[in-house]
């Protein structure tokens, strides 16, 4: 149930900052007036190269990826490379026409829901956000595309988690992913101080465990936190182990995952907004394959050292649960 870093090797793509909403917790400052986006050719080439480097999953986010016209082309390229595909969306644009166009291209839809309807609308900065999303769910079920919900956990909405889980089950979702708020982008301005604290994380684990037992496999519950014990037992899983020269021939996916492609073409480790000091590079400067080779030569060790520092910080603390990606990302930005 605790799964901040799985065994899958994930390429997360943010192709556009264009969005139909201006959510309070948006990490990328996306909105209706944004037009920055990456070309189909650039992303399809990157996906093919990433597959050769061992990445097995392409996850499309945004912005709102349903507003990215070449979405299907990128997803189909991923399928051609043998990769699994997912799309994270606010769910408001999942009409029958769009879903028909995307049929066969998406392996999993991840739809955002941030609490009871009024709380969801407030977070989404739109009084019709929940109703519009909910009205699209019959089309999602009709499409046959497997789907789940993503719930952003803050200091203020844990009590709404049981309602969200019951809503997810009743709508036919397979998964409920609970993701702690990261105070980056617009969230740093609009939700400053709202990230879950130590007590909130502990309460979230208890609630998630109870929900998991209650639904008994009918709804998978995933909490995006890592326990201190997990880090101590398996540092390699978090790229926090001692690296040696034998790693020079390893594919990039064995050195960093998730890998993030941001809307400006930057390729960074682990999480949107990660320090560019550790960036794999920019897709506008060189092909993905070239960037990967250069990163292995020039930055692999420094990234490994950073992960080891994050590992030490967490395992030497008395706190049981941690947001691994956020911890390492914050360390990357303060050096």
Briefly describe each language-model feature range.
Residues 1-3, 7, 266-335:
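Flexible mid-to-C-terminal extensions adjoining Fe-S/redox cofactors in radical SAM and related proteins
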Residues 1-101, 105:
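Conserved alpha-helical substructure of the radical SAM core
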Residues 19, 23-26, 252, 270, ...:
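Short cysteine clusters
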Residues 26, 58, 109, 176-179:
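Hydrophobic residues within beta-strands of alpha/beta enzymes
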Residues 64, 92-93, 115, 154-155, ...:
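Conserved beta-strand edge residues that scaffold enzyme active sites
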Residues 68, 94-96, 158-161, 268:
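Short, well-ordered alpha-helical microsegments
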Residues 81, 105, 112, 122, ...:
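Radical SAM enzyme [4Fe-4S]-AdoMet core and its adjacent flexible, acidic
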């Amino acid at each position: 149930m605790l799964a901040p870093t799985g065994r899958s090797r994930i390429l997360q793509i943010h192709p556009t900052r264009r969005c139909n909403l201006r959510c309070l917790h948006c990490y990328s400052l996306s909105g209706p007036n944004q037009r920055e986006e990456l070309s189909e050719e650039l992303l399809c080439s990157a996906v093919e190269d990433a597959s050769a480097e061992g990445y097995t999953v392409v996850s499309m986010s945004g912005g709102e990826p349903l507003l990215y016209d070449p979405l299907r082309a990128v997803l189909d390229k991923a399928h051609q490379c043998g990769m699994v595909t997912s799309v994270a969306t606010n769910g408001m644009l999942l009409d029958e026409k769009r879903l028909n166009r995307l049929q066969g291209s998406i392996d999993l839809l991840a739809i955002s829901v941030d609490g009871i309807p009024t709380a969801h609308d407030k977070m989404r900065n739109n009084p019709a956000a929940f109703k519009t999303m909910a009205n699209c769910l019959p089309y999602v079920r009709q499409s046959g595309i497997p789907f789940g919900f993503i719930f952003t956990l803050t200091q203020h909405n844990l009590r709404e988690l049981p309602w969200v889980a019951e809503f997810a089950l009743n709508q036919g979702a397979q998964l409920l992913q609970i993701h702690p708020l990261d105070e980056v982008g617009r969230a740093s301005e609009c939700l400053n101080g709202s990230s879950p604290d130590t007590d909130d994380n502990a309460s979230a684990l208890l609630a998630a465990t109870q929900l998991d037992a209650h639904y008994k496999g009918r709804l998978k519950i995933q909490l995006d936190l890592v326990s201190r014990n997990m880090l101590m037992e398996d540092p390699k899983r978090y790229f926090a182990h001692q690296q040696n020269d034998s790693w020079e021939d390893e594919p990039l996916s064995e050195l960093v995952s998730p890998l993030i492609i941001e809307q400006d073409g930057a390729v960074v480790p682990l999480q949107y907004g990660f320090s560019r000091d550790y960036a794999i590079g920019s897709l506008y400067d060189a092909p993905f394959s070239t960037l990967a080779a250069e990163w292995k030569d020039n930055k692999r060790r420094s990234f490994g050292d950073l992960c080891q520092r994050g590992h030490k910080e967490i395992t030497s603390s008395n706190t049981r649960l941690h947001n691994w990606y956020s911890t390492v990302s914050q360390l990357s930005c303060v050096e």
